[in-house]
Amino acid sequence: MISKFGSVHILAVVAIQLLIIPSVSSLNLTNAYLHHKCNNTEGKYSHGSAFEKYINLALRAIDSDNYLNGFAYIERGEDPNKVFVMYQCRGDSYGSKCKSCISAAISGLRRRCPKSKGAVIWYDQCLFEISTINSFNKIDYENDFYLSNPNDVNDKELFNKETSALLEELTNKATDKNNMIGNKFVLYAAGDKRIGTKNVYAMVQCTKDLVTTTSAACFEWIFKMFSKCCEGKQGGRVLGTSCNFRYELYPFLRN
């Protein structure tokens, strides 16, 4: 798979494993590391500092969560050492599966971005972010990347048209104001569609701090990258910290 992060194009060797997963059951167990970014402009904290104290308080709050909502946005501390921590799990990953992914993400981020005040990491089933900036209900236009299958489909024109239509249909469902659990917007939808001789499986998701209007704007933004990452490809995804989409020719979600 070819990966793009920011304005840099690289070959993401780790993403090759996404092409060779042999079964739905193994897909359900996959939690591959995808990407990370250390936001150096936010600086670093020192051992024993107030910022480290507040990060640890935020992480303890996350650790005590039941992960049933699959999302949390936590604020700890006071200026100038205020910490904002967010996690979100994929729409089919919650409870113990969500917790397992977030634990891996926290460990991975600490290893890859030691003592960074701002950093984000993506795994196959979750994302985790630490920041000094309050981004609640705000779209992050800075941090995104894409992964695509190197193999092409046969009828590219038909495939692009119908896959785009499926993603648009799922977006409308995800951003429907009636798509709620309790008093919270779901902002997630998944489905499949027969295109020619193939079944296409897809999902769209936004972080649950967004409202439906903000999430619709986020989806519109990432769908503009479809032509760069995915046209004519057998699989592809665009991931940001605020929203993402994915489609494949095989099932990749739990029922």
From Swiss-Prot:
Domain (Gnk2-homologous): residue spans on this chain: 33-135, 141-252
UniProt feature coiled coil, ranges: none
Keyword Repeat attributed: yes
Matches recorded under Pfam families: Stress-antifung (PF01657)
Domain of life: Eukaryota
Keywords: Repeat, Secreted, Signal
Keyword Secreted assigned: yes
GO cellular component: extracellular region
Chief localisation class: secreted
Signal sequence interval, chain numbering: 1-26
Subcellular location, record wording: Secreted
Recorded family membership: Belongs to the cysteine-rich repeat secretory protein family.
Protein name listed in UniProt: Putative cysteine-rich repeat secretory protein 27
